[in-house]
């Protein structure tokens, strides 16, 4: 992927959630909501504090993260749709 995020921006690829209910009903794409979790593809260097010191991000490439329904800006890079969001839009990291 040819994109390098700036400051506290994070590039996230949506990860599709399970499309079948517990009772076996398949949910069509048109009826389901967009997934609210994804995989971090790239991270920026971090933002700067009031003294100019750079603050590193908590998330790293490969993390599986949770984010809000309306978080980030969808863009296409190399034909692939990804989200560009601030680290503060990420609610948490899923731990296996």
Curated annotation (Swiss-Prot):
Q: Which UniProt keywords apply?
A: Chaperone, Cytoplasm
Q: List the disulfide bonds.
A: none
Q: PROSITE patterns from the xrefs? A: CHAPERONINS_CPN10
Q: Name one GO molecular function term.
A: unfolded protein binding
| Subcellular locations according to the entry | Cytoplasm
> InterPro entries from the xrefs?
Chaperonin_GroES, Chaperonin_GroES_sf, Chaprnonin_Cpn10_CS, GroES-like_sf
Coiled coil start-end: none
Provide the primary localization. cytoplasm
A single GO BP term for this record reads: chaperone cofactor-dependent protein refolding
Q: Which GO cellular component terms, listed alphabetically, does the Swiss-Prot or TrEMBL entry include?
A: cytoplasm
Give the family from UniProt: Belongs to the GroES chaperonin family.
What HAMAP family is this protein classified in? CH10 (MF_00580)
Describe the protein's quaternary organization and the partners it interacts with. Heptamer of 7 subunits arranged in a ring. Interacts with the chaperonin GroEL.
Provide the function of this protein: Together with the chaperonin GroEL, plays an essential role in assisting protein folding. The GroEL-GroES system forms a nano-cage that allows encapsulation of the non-native substrate proteins and provides a physical environment optimized to promote and accelerate protein folding. GroES binds to the apical surface of the GroEL ring, thereby capping the opening of the GroEL channel.
Q: What is this protein called?
A: Co-chaperonin GroES
- Gene behind this chain? groES
């Amino acid at each position: 992927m040819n994109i390098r995020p700036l400051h506290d921006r994070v590039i996230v690829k949506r990860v599709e959630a399970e499309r079948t209910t517990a009772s076996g009903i398949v949910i069509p794409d048109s009826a389901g909501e967009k997934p609210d979790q994804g995989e971090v593809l790239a991270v920026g260097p971090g933002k700067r504090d009031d003294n100019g010191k750079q603050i590193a991000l908590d998330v790293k490439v490969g993390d599986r993260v949770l984010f809000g329904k309306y978080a980030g800006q969808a863009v296409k890079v190399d034909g692939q749709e990804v989200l560009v969001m601030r680290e503060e839009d990420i609610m948490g990291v899923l731990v296996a």
